Amino acid sequence: MADSQNTQSSSSASGSYQVPAYERKPGVAGKISSVGSDTLANLMTFWSQEFKTLYPQVGFQIQASGSSTAPPALIEGTATIGPMSRELKPSEIRDFTRTHGYPPTVLKVAMDAIAIFVDRRNPLPGMTLEQVDAVFSETQFCGSNTAITNWSQLGVDDIGYRSPIRLYGRNSVSGTYGLFKVMALCDGDFKNTVNEQPGSASVVLSVASGTGAIGYAAYGYKTAGVRALPLGESLDSLIPLSIDTVRNETYPFARFLYLVINKKPGEPLPTLEREFLRYILSQEGQQQVLRDGYFPIREDVLVRQRRLLE
């Protein structure tokens, strides 16, 4: 653990920021229950394991069935924290507010991107956003007039890629599913040939297991068997998925990852919950984000999130 006086400095157009190292506090014990995103499952595990090395008397229960399971658990009081890979829907905010009398507090804790994965041998250099819609969508609301069902329509005619494209994606309780539907399909409908998987790891494994497959999933689950395609408005302006293009949000499907909590306005959080969130929004917590293959939030954003805990 870094010394508590160490800080990580950064500057932006709006000023200079200090991201503090985490400082251990006395008397932290209890149990945290987390219900929500599969995308954040590994990261929640990393955070909880490292936090337990600081506070052995703390226990965690982590359930990762999808972002849509987080709001009901917070409303019913069966979860302390609700990890989500998408923003809350207006209806979810209304339901929470109706129950508790105030809205939920939403913290940005990491950055991710929804990647379009192909197997590592696939020669496709990249895709336009219109092509992505034409591959995955039944309705093609993003502008394409022709559905894409074969690799030859994307300029790939190598042996092994002459059969119809096999499609993989997430199931409907996933925040990744809902966000991809909005961002990539212009809120259209998925083709019924998309093989829905319970987790991003399953999507990546399916794409890597044989030629001719393509799938969308959280970039943090990338393996050596797949490649994330550059994307853009045109084939002449493809943007690779990298830490820079995600953090500056130029990659088309960049997104924040969130933790939703129940914080009554004007009252402090319980000590255990506050300290766990302070750890996440510290140098050490953001190092775990990198460890899991995601991207730390910009320092100016992080400082704003820490203020929400006050």
Regions found by a protein language model. Name each.
Residues 2-310:
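Flexible loop/hinge segments at secondary-structure junctions
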